[in-house]
Amino acid sequence: LTVTLLGDLKNGRTTHSLVRLLSHYGVRVNFVSPPSLAMPREVIREVVKHGMAVYETSNLDEVIGTTDVLYVTRIQRERFASQDEYEAVKGCYVVNNDVLARAKPDLAVLHPLPRVDEIDPEVDFDIKRAAYFRQMRCGLYIRMALLAMVMQSSDRS
């Protein structure tokens, strides 16, 4: 299984925890980001130590054809000291139907949401590939179950 993480990999808590989890399952991971938003070196060292194969690039086209799961993150304005820094990387990756045309037919596109402009709304209509709404729905049920477990264990105390 090849998972590609795309976007702001430096500041995204979800990308850091996801790649750490995946490092226990023999998954190959591609990191695609602008150099200024690359996955932190300490995270890469940690997952490589677990035997994970990683590849870093700033070019999505290099890896989209071999990707099984595309995990897209937004580039957040609040992470930049100036508007100019943000403008330099804003919109550098947009997943749209043209990108999906170069991808595997069974590619799953995930996103932690909310999104800005990194996934074109036209992708929403690709029911098979646009898995982020299913991801959101399942995440709701997971959080409900975790809260129920925590509440039950606190009742026993």
Stretches with model-predicted labels:
Residues 106-107, 112-157:
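Adenosine-phosphate binding glycine-rich loop
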Residues 1-72:
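Glycine-rich phosphate/diphosphate-binding loop of Rossmann-like nucleotide-binding domains
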Residues 29-31, 54-57, 94-98, 133-136, ...:
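Glycine-rich loops and low-complexity Gly/Arg-rich segments
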Residues 33-38, 99-105, 138-144:
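Short C-terminal domain-edge/linker segments immediately following a structured domain
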Residues 45-123:
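Rossmann-like adenosine-cofactor binding region
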Residues 6-8, 32-34, 89, 112, ...:
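Glycine- and other small-residue-rich loops at beta-strand/loop junctions that grip anionic moieties
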Residues 17, 21-24, 62, 98-102, ...:
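Alpha-helical scaffold segments in soluble metabolic enzymes
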